[in-house]
Amino acid sequence: MYRDNTKVVKIGKCVIGGGNPILIQSMTNTHTEDVAATVAQIKELTKAGCEIIRCTVPTKEAALAIKEIKKQIEIPLVADIHFDYKMAIMAMENGADKIRINPGNIGGTDKIKAVVDVARERNIPIRVGVNSGSLEKDLIEKYGGVTAEGIVESALDKVKIIEDLGYDNLVVSIKSSDVMMCVKAHELIAKQTNHPLHVGITESGTIFSGSIKSSIGLGLILNQGIGDTIRVSLTDDPVREIEAAKLILKTLGLRKGGIEVVSCPTCGRTRINLIDLAGKVEKMVSGYDLDSVSYTHLTLPTILRV
């Protein structure tokens, strides 16, 4: 599988790539400057099963807040940088375990080099992120529109910028809200780089549509052995992202644990309020992350039929 051959990258205490388990990420939707609110949400996400958290760092205050946030959380923190390279540097100086940038958005080579120099000094991985919504005009013209090929070329061009500066502690992400375009892009890039890949369907939507789009897209990608970390992007409480991501991994056989609730879809023979009962049971067992339940000399599968 592709993921068995990707480079090993250390993010805080976590290790990805090289066949290591796929880790689940999410992103806070608090103002990072609000340390108390951000820490509270990260702790809630950690309890739900989040293993890496990303926070936006648009201001100096947000970058400085990372130091205090890091003191109070247990999982690695990724600083999300959009345009100001100085925020990337400040975030790393204040304890970020990884930064996410699009080199095309933060300025010339001198600014990228300044970021890379600090990352190299502190051995902090850089996630090179490319989104179909911000694809360069020349690539749109070259491929006759926004395409998987264009997304991949854009990402690899940006990876090369950093590699040419002598740094390869990298993670790559290529995202699109078009599910099949995203799948194709990952199939293409997995053949052209051995950097670990962060996988997700960007702006996938609300809890219903977003979960369906993400399960199809991530399922098709992960089942080919592609992907080292994942995020299910939802317009909802970030905890729901973790719940969906865990279920996707379990369904693909890429993660164990928990109790699977199997229930009848109901029909005219049903004599109880099974819909309500199944929902209550699923909620009751949602916190159990056990591979199996031991009962005397038997080991029972963790499937509960309602």
What are the language-model segments listed below?
Residues 140-293:
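Catalytic alpha/beta core domains of metabolic enzymes, predominantly
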Residues 62-79, 118-123, 189-194:
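Alpha-helix-loop-beta-strand connector modules within alpha/beta enzyme cores
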Residues 47-68, 103-107, 170-177:
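Glycine-rich, proline-tolerant flexible connector loops at the mouths of alpha/beta enzymes
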